[in-house]
């Protein structure tokens, strides 16, 4: 259909040109014939074929009008052809989209386009693609940063929860320890306020004297066999152990009961010396600590007697 339209337009243009050519030839022949036959009463200027001024002006106007109408007619004739060419280009572009790489959007490059304009449009298209890539990269960075922030926040919340549980556990342990020490202190007071086996009834001064003797006996002997301690104060071994634990709970004495049934008394000054040694040395092995403890802690009895350690 497009080919037929183009052929028709070309034939029409050809007919117009041929008609104009014949008309021009006919006018030329008429003027030549008139010049060849001089007429009476006709000025010599007209007989010689020299046109009048009015004729000259009219001819100029006709030529000017023809020159003005020629581009419009050519444009009107070329418009269908251009439309047909554009249609063919669109179909070729569609075929290229299906069978090959897609032409970038905004880069419609006409074959008749100048090299300078083509380069300008290509540069503009390149900038557009670069902006799109930068926007894509920016979005990717935002997504990555948001993910990292979420993971960091989750880790911080987990660490905060662990720390909170640790503090809560320490608080509960401290409260439990204080409660237990208070109960042991109350038991000790009750034990020394009632009559027990091995002690005669007496007034408060005698009880305080007995307690002071009990404590001094431990301090003097340093290492006390629990059975000997119970025998010295006419107590059962379990009662002696409980009283030592009560005295430890209220801070009257410090020491440790080993697995051989002995209580080893350590003074506050000796504990401070051991703590100072550990602080000065930093990390201390068990062997070094044992060796230094033998030097810093004096286990020699102050006085020996009937109830001293064997």
From Swiss-Prot:
TM region(s), chain numbering: 3-23
Biased composition (Basic and acidic residues): 109-157
Major subcellular location class: endoplasmic reticulum
Keywords: Endoplasmic reticulum, Membrane, Transmembrane, Transmembrane helix, Ubl conjugation pathway
Membrane association type: Single-pass membrane protein
Record localization: Endoplasmic reticulum membrane
Lumenal side: 1-2
GO molecular function: ubiquitin-like protein ligase binding
This protein's GO CC annotations: endoplasmic reticulum membrane
Cytoplasmic side: 24-310
Region (Disordered): 31-52, 91-157
Pfam families for the chain: DDRGK
Gene3D superfamilies from the UniProt entry: Winged helix-like DNA-binding domain superfamily/Winged helix DNA-binding domain
Database matches in PANTHER family: DDRGK DOMAIN-CONTAINING PROTEIN 1 (PTHR48176:SF1)
Biological role stated in the UniProt entry: Substrate adapter for ufmylation, the covalent attachment of the ubiquitin-like modifier UFM1 to substrate proteins. Required for ufmylation of Atg9; protects the nervous system during aging, possibly by stabilizing Atg9 and supporting its function.
Similarity comment text for this entry: Belongs to the DDRGK1 family.
Assembly mode: Interacts with Atg9; the interaction is transient.
Name of the featured protein: DDRGK domain-containing protein 1
Chain's gene name: Ddrgk1
